[in-house]
Amino acid sequence: RAAEEARTLQGEYREGTTRGHEGWEAIVKPEPMGTVLCITPYNYPLSTTALEVAPALAAGNSVILKPASKTPVSAAILADVVSELDLPDGAFNFVPGRGSTIGDLLVGDGRVNTITMTGSSGAGKHVARKSGMVNLHMELGGNAPAVVFPDADLSEVAGACTKGSLKYAGQRCSAV
């Protein structure tokens, strides 16, 4: 039976590019995941939100956008823009509120098939525990290192690191 199934595989064939797997092929068949919960951060409230919402909608999913409670206005403006699109009713849902109340309800709802989240490692662990381990896509707790080579001008390095760490009040994963 499995051999027969191989004859009916549909999708796009892509050659593997991972070292050690050259020449291997993968079959990619894009399919909607269902309902995608997008939990977005406060430090990049518009760009990260758009990067989570747009692909989910484009792939045919229903989206629930739960922005950071500290910075919901950018997401609300994006929600207004999305409301102008010709989407089916219920395809996009904007749900602001505190993570400890609204977020926990959404994360634990069995109708959510996938959760995409950008935030702290602690919040990510909490979401993973509450979600029942549905499909998770997370970018958590980034701390960009500063690699300093022996021949670097230390005065220039110190200035660049200080400047980077103070941008956005240091609240970005690529601060240094």
Which residues does each predicted region cover?
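N-terminal Rossmann NAD(P)-binding subdomain characteristic of aldehyde/semialdehyde dehydrogenases
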Residues: 1-50, 87, 92
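Structural signal for hydrophobic packing residues in well-ordered secondary-structure cores
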Residues: 3-10, 82, 86, 110, ...
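Glycine-rich phosphate-binding loop at the start of an alpha helix
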Residues: 30, 47-50, 69-72, 76, ...
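Generic beta-strand/beta-sheet core signal
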Residues: 39, 66-68, 95-97, 117-120, ...
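PLP-dependent aminotransferase-like
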Residues: 49-103
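Active-site phosphate-binding strand-loop segment of PLP-dependent enzymes
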Residues: 89-123
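ALDH superfamily catalytic-core signature
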Residues: 114, 122-176
